[in-house]
């Protein structure tokens, strides 16, 4: 008879009959193996028992784990303390032999929260007789009920399990596995996951610190309770509050938790597990350098004003050229056409009159606009300081019939000095008068120099010793008589003549610059007209071409004199005096826009407009445009100013003729 001992118990072939069950004996044999005893034939037969292969689909077993004693405690096996109870549908097997403690031990553990483990849906590769099998597990925690009678304590199967579990019989090795089924390797956890499982590991809600000396997933006989005191660290450990990663609801104790393989998130249900997904962050591409910006780096994101969207840049070096482009575009967009000078520039002033906004590019244009429209501002005329009320600035200066307000007396004094400096500048008529007077004196002096040269050449040789020639010149204007004694050596006479000749040549060159009168054909005018040419065209308006055989174009259309007439909505007819026809280019031009207009316009460019099919529409649209109206105002104002200046010049010319008759008397002695 073969024997083996387990902690003082001798096990023989009759041990199963004495214990009443093969499972009891098998569990005792496992205990023997775990403590280093060699396996006996009874255990071998138990492991190779056909009971294991009878039913591969066993119900899920709930294993209630109670605080185990320390590893060094002696194992006391007593037949009275081993009670086996299973569900009604479960067959006793060596693989599932479980021995609960006595009711006295359970009563001593009252107050310690026990945990219920449901093994389901986790695939572990285990070896049984050389064959590999896979299973899955999830863990459900619960509070088992403790009753006074031990025969009422049983194990029940879980209705939530989707697959059955089979555990291979292996030698019990305390310290090999922890409660959650993780292997201890060199004092560390090493969790094995199945690659095909959609739930990789189980959630654990530890209420008490587990001792690493118990393998809760291996068949083991629960020993008699020993006095066990937890350490201070174990007493201070508190369960962490765990919530569902999707719905953020807290996971209660006893609730099934789900976890995806390779993820640390826990879920309360499969619905939350399937609905929760981590989308991969797409790499953003920089606008300038076209590089994929890493998500870990802080990218520079700026809004685009035009689209109100955001653009990402890999670094500030990419941002700098883009900012420069935006600044250039912004500067172009901010430019508008000035109402006064018609230049495309940055607008500095905007004036709204009768719901019409007038844009002005500079202070000079703004002052012109104010004077033209009679606007008065509550600010100092000199420094521009704002005065909130009219009573603030009592310093008022009347200049040219207009009241100008100043903030202080110093501004008035500076403004007066500035006006005096401007008044010292000669007007155009005074400049012309002074130039004419200078020319007359030059001519007379040039003639006198020639006379002196002739006299010097006719002097006899005996008088060559004379070193000096005394010349007395008396000249005066009105009652003023100037006497000069000029000593001219013979060598200086030629220098004087050359100087006068150069002055006359410069004067003739200046006179040659003055352009001649332009022709009446606008097609022959230069692209840019100077001030004198423009004044000439304003004073002498070119006539409109009439009674002319206008040529036809390729479509058989031609210009007609009817375009010179505009029919108003009330039926009245007016003449378009600004419309000019060019016989050289067979096109029409706008006189006002040609003289004062800027920008692109069919009626002011070099070739003019020759779209005879749509000319009526073009003319109607053009004469109602803001640019044409402004140019017509400038034309009328310049024409009136030229008329006034012409009258003034005529009066000044008469005065000059009278002064000329009084003349300048030159006396040569």
UniProtKB/Swiss-Prot annotation:
GO terms for cellular component: nucleus. SUPFAM superfamilies: Glucocorticoid receptor-like (DNA-binding domain). A zinc finger (MYM-type) spans 265-299, 311-351, 358-393, 404-431. GO terms for biological process: negative regulation of transcription by RNA polymerase II. InterPro entries: TRASH_dom, Znf_MYM, ZnF_MYMT-QRICH1. GO terms for molecular function: zinc ion binding. Keywords: Isopeptide bond, Metal-binding, Nucleus, Repeat, Transcription, Transcription regulation, Ubl conjugation, Zinc, Zinc-finger. It is found in: Nucleus. There is a cross-link at residues 88, 91, 134, 149, 166, 225, 443, 455, 462, 552 (Glycyl lysine isopeptide (Lys-Gly) (interchain with G-Cter in SUMO2)). Functions as a transcriptional regulator. Interacts (via N-terminal 120 amino acid region) with ETV5 (via C-terminal). This is Zinc finger MYM-type protein 5. It comes from Homo sapiens (Human). The gene is ZMYM5.
